[in-house]
């Protein structure tokens, strides 16, 4: 059933196949950012471009040709704001600029560590006396929660499975590389979604003895906002006093981030989801003991794992990826690129008959 549904979803996506931005593209953008801010990195309005209208930047920005020098405000928080800008006049190389009064140094350091493992690419950091500026990848789909809320009627089961699989696999990779890493705030607002043209090309995800073959359906998840994050080599004084009520600590359970993400995903699906989200909700109910779902139980507080509770019954990554939810990626499915119809050969024009 799941495999057939997965194949039907792939067929529906075939018309949108295109070319996605690659790691080499991000590397090139990063080099241009560093070159641009070399002399006046504290004044992004003088070195970047933005679209010359009032529209919100999205996927169409790559086709925009009317631009002007400056940036566009796209978000604000307690300590600062986020702006959109481009390093090229054609606005094909877009970036985000986070400006705030509090230091962004730790967030930049952790961002650099995690960007190869499903984190948002960070390009540069500037300490500018009364403000701190971080230049990073621009993500056009917004937060995971907003993405689901605004597209609830168009998302298919394959999209939810893609989101779940990408996040869990990247957390698995992060903890293999940096076992001490804790994001500590991985809810649906701190995961961003990049929307691009699907390529339907496949990528292998290896978790122990499990190998998943995952198609590119035009959605890429990105971890962001490392304001409460830590590693054994990067301390974070802002987490002091958050251990009892929020379970946030360098000594929190290794699956702290995984649990918070799955619990948050369940809450978002309950609030905004439709029939397409039911399979994902059932997966979360199946994989996590009931005392890990919700806001407060003897195992969790404020939707998060309690620091001093016994979490030995929480599933490992191997157990999670062994669940039937991932069968469509474990089964041998017909090459997804073959769903793209072949172009019909052009018949040669008949030769004119002699008069």
Region annotations inferred by a language model:
Residues 72, 76-113:
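ATP-binding glycine-rich loop module of kinase domains
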Residues 41-42, 46-89:
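ATP-binding glycine-rich phosphate-binding loop
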Residues 168-176:
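Short C-lobe core helix of eukaryotic-like protein kinase catalytic domains
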Residues 13, 234, 238-239, 245-344:
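Helical subdomain adjoining the active site within ATP-dependent kinase catalytic cores
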Residues 120-157:
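Conserved structural core of kinase catalytic domains
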Residues 176-189, 193-194:
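Catalytic-loop of the protein kinase fold
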